[in-house]
Amino acid sequence: MASSQPLHGTASPSLVHDDNNPNSSTASPVLEGRDSPNLPLTMTASTVLMTLPRDATAALAEAGTFDQEKVVIRFKPVGSAPALRREQVKVLSTHSFETVVAYLRKTLKVQETDSVFLYVNSVFAPALDEVVGNLWRCFKDSTNQLNVSYSMTPSFG
């Protein structure tokens, strides 16, 4: 049994043309018989949400804060890299990883032309602008230390 009515969701595009409007000569395709999809709106595009929900406001307020003001970093030499006298140091959570690299270069007395490669948990080399507190929060070990391996030649990753 063929029906002359199109099934819901299978309507073909038809052109809408307004004879009274001279500017409507270029008609745009319109899908008739289709409901508009329920697309999620961002909070900034929503006309219903005038303010953020309390949970979102609290989460955003705490996003840049850290549980500890300073975090412990444990340095581990890899390969022929010299060992440090103090393998653990405390660094402010808000500092960038560049601060850790500068400290290690200064402590090892590395020339400006020489390279030092740093890896978190012997897996990846973080970007210099990465925040130490974020690295610690995501990759600390069971003793609440961030393990940073260092080498004079590329080792991991």
Swiss-Prot record:
The keyword Phosphoprotein does not apply. It is found in: Preautophagosomal structure membrane. It is a peripheral membrane protein. There is a cross-link at residue 157 (Glycyl lysine isopeptide (Gly-Lys) (interchain with K-263 in ATG5)). It comes from Neurospora crassa (strain ATCC 24698 / 74-OR23-1A / CBS 708.71 / DSM 1257 / FGSC 987). Keywords: Autophagy, Isopeptide bond, Membrane, Protein transport, Transport, Ubl conjugation pathway. One of its GO terms (molecular function) is protein tag activity. Residues 1-38 are annotated as: Disordered. Pfam families: APG12. The lineage of its organism: Eukaryota, Fungi, Dikarya, Ascomycota, Pezizomycotina. Forms a conjugate with apg-4/atg5. This is Ubiquitin-like protein atg12. Gene3D superfamilies: Phosphatidylinositol 3-kinase Catalytic Subunit, Chain A, domain 1. It comes from the Eukaryota. Disulfide bonds: none annotated. Residues 1-13 have a biased composition (Polar residues).
